[in-house]
Amino acid sequence: MESCFPAMKLNQCTFGLNNEIVSERVSAFWGTQVVKPNHLRTTKLRSAPQKKIQTNLIRSVLTPFVDQESHEPLLRTQNADPKNVASIILGGGAGTRLFPLTSKRAKPAVPIGGCYRLIDIPMSNCINSGIRKIFILTQFNSFSLNRHLSRTYNFGNGVNFGDGFVEVLAATQTSGDAGKKWFQGTADAVRQFIWVFEDAKTKNVEHVLILSGDHLYRMDYMNFVQKHIESNADITVSCLPMDESRASDFGLLKIDQSGKIIQFSEKPKGDDLKAMQVDTSILGLPPKEAAESPYIASMGVYVFRKEVLLKLLRSSYPTSNDFGSEIIPLAVGEHNVQAFLFNDYWEDIGTIGSFFDANLALTEQPPKFQFYDQKTPFFTSPRFLPPTKVDKCRILDSIVSHGCFLRECSVQHSIVGIRSRLESGVELQDTMMMGADFYQTEAEIASLLAEGKVPVGVGQNTKIKNCIIDKNAKIGKNVVIANADGVEEGDRPEEGFHIRSGITVVLKNATIRDGLHI
């Protein structure tokens, strides 16, 4: 089904999928997982060689008078069961850092990778992890997000969840003083819907995942939950090494030798930032990488024991509104809060710059992240579009999505979204084009051109570089978008664009007149 197929990736002289490069790293801190029967699973830290001991011999020595066949092994670890896990995906705030892409949509609804939306990342990770009890909390500009979720993840014509469910919980006002306010933060959003865990559908839930709707990564959440169970944690925070240039944008933490978090600071600055430096070689990083990434950053992905989450939100910290800046730092001193090292690609799509870079990085060889994985596909709305039609084009290191028309144009290091139309002479370089929500017929296009109007797509002989083109944009003939003056920040909404971090952003449904130079 098209809903789980990625867009077509085109490289110079290469038309097809690339072999995925898989690597593993053994951590001196976290150890390597020993494969044993499920009832006898443990973790072995890297240390001096140890002699193997028969576990049944240990039992015969320690319990010589016990009937072995009538008792469970002493070394028993509970296995994580996805049926006992529920996930809550946060729809995000107003998304001011991603403006203007969030002017008419929620952050998780922002298109990415040619044919996906950001919400598809945590949703697909949940599905691939076997988690079928999913709540999505929405508030700001949630129309397109709700529409995408209803079209994609439902029982009728989307992904089949069996006995699971996907519930979209939109912010609403209820009786009482607290119910008269909108969400005040991530924790407050969950608090206002905490009653869902009293519902019959969640009676067997033991652990609750808190996920963000604006991150790009692939993760098996059940490995995360298993670590949470094995460490007997009340809360587990997924984390990764971070360099100094971006450390102040994240929650930072310090851990002890057992992986327990002993200090947590949300987005520290100045001296507070320096105080959070640690020797990340404890995570198994080589000395050079440890020196380059002297911080441990929270991914904003948490798992709570359900009863602990309810207690924290209801009674322990009833006025705390945010997980990262309030709940987690307060809980560190009173609860067993553990760290889980995620040693793979992860990107916070929080700014125009990071969004732009993460998209274009998908075209690189080899990419740090890719949607091409048969075992863990990413799902999206089934649009049933035809293949892309390419006529005498030059395409290098790019991704071209479904249902596009490309005529005698050049596309280099760019992403071309669904239903895009590029006319002859167009040059697209270092550009993320989101595509369109609809087609215009040849007759409609001819009529618009005859009237001096601009159809959806990119007109003849237009040159575009270092740009994000939002959906349904109409860009005329002989236009040049290159930010030749090197403007870092600029606002020209009356002409259909803004500039953020030196990147030109053409607005959704905007019209760029013929011959305009930006």
Swiss-Prot record:
Alphabetical UniProt keywords: Allosteric enzyme, ATP-binding, Chloroplast, Nucleotide-binding, Nucleotidyltransferase, Phosphoprotein, Plastid, Starch biosynthesis, Transferase, Transit peptide
Chief subcellular location: plastid
Activity regulation field: Activated by 3'phosphoglycerate, inhibited by orthophosphate. Allosteric regulation.
Residues where Phosphoserine is found: 424
GO molecular function, one term: ATP binding
Tissue: Probably are expressed in roots, flowers and/or seeds.
Pfam families assigned: LbH_GLGC, NTP_transferase
GO biological process, one term: starch biosynthetic process
SUPFAM superfamilies reported for this sequence: Nucleotide-diphospho-sugar transferases, Trimeric LpxA-like enzymes
Pathway membership, UniProt: Glycan biosynthesis; starch biosynthesis
Transmembrane spans: none
InterPro entries, alphabetized: ADP-Glc_PPase (IPR011831), ADP_Glu_pyroP_CS (IPR005836), NTP_transferase_dom (IPR005835), Nucleotide-diphossugar_trans (IPR029044), Trimer_LpxA-like_sf (IPR011004)
Signal sequence residues: none
Record keyword Transferase present: yes
Domain of life: Eukaryota
One GO cellular component, as annotated: chloroplast
Enzyme Commission identifier(s): 2.7.7.27
Catalytic function, reaction form: alpha-D-glucose 1-phosphate + ATP + H(+) = ADP-alpha-D-glucose + diphosphate
Subcellular location: Plastid, Chloroplast
Record text on subunit structure and interactions: Heterotetramer.
Database matches in PANTHER family: GLUCOSE-1-PHOSPHATE ADENYLYLTRANSFERASE LARGE SUBUNIT 1, CHLOROPLASTIC-RELATED, GLUCOSE-1-PHOSPHATE ADENYLYLTRANSFERASE-RELATED
UniProt function note: This protein plays a role in synthesis of starch. It catalyzes the synthesis of the activated glycosyl donor, ADP-glucose from Glc-1-P and ATP.
Family: Belongs to the bacterial/plant glucose-1-phosphate adenylyltransferase family.
Name used for this protein in its record: Glucose-1-phosphate adenylyltransferase large subunit 2, chloroplastic
Source organism of this protein record: Arabidopsis thaliana
Gene: APL2
